[in-house]
Amino acid sequence: TLYWVPSALAIVSNWNVFDFARPEHLQKILFAGEVMPVKHLNYWRRYLPDCLYANLFGPTETTDICSFYVVDRNFADSDSLPIGRACNNCDTFLLTEEGTRASRTGEEGEIVVRGSFLADGYYNEPEKTAAVFTQNPLNTAFPERIYRTGDLARLNEKGEFIYISRKDFQIKRMGYRIELGEIEAAAGSIEKVKSAAALYDADTGRILVIYEGSIKDTDEVLQQTADKVPPYMRPDEVIRIKQMPYNANGKIDRQRLLKEYCGA
């Protein structure tokens, strides 16, 4: 069994490692911690088709994995991978901005978790604890503690959660609510783009896409990204870098990118 963050799996596919050697002994490949780009998943499935692949979701505050999706069908490179359904002994649902439980295909909301394994809260941070560990607003009959993850998702036609982005990764510009995660996913799905990050420069109101890949023409990446998102989500600028920075957890170092390209 292999349990990695998607960024680590992407390194293998970006460097075409399986052209030289393949871990044929692997039976299960699990990933969690960030969004898994489908084009990288497809690379792994192409070379190791007999493995079981599972996308796991579980914030630190839940102390365990709370939902999972076992890959059971084919996806196009531009598709989004579900994070599945709740594990045993817990429940996950989407809480809409109106305070209702999302139930229709395409409906969006914040991922909420309830169950016996929720953390007690944040050490010496009572205000932060009270903001996200709250009473279930859908249950007025008795006390029921929930954790509001701050992650946004939508329901697909199968009732599975499709991850969108963090709530703090959401911006409003020109009257539109924009999910930077969708822009990032669109850019990252482009062939020959190894990884991409969407940033918002609050000082200038501009959306930037930073990418690593072999496409030298940034206008080409800009146009392909724009073709995959609504007009109001079109990036203002695309920048190519030699190597995407990663933090100690193997995730894209957004703070470093913001500091370097947005002056944050």
Question: Which residue stretches match the model-derived regions?
Answer:
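Structural motif
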Residues: 5-7, 33, 212-214
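AMP-dependent adenylate-forming
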Residues: 52-55, 70-264
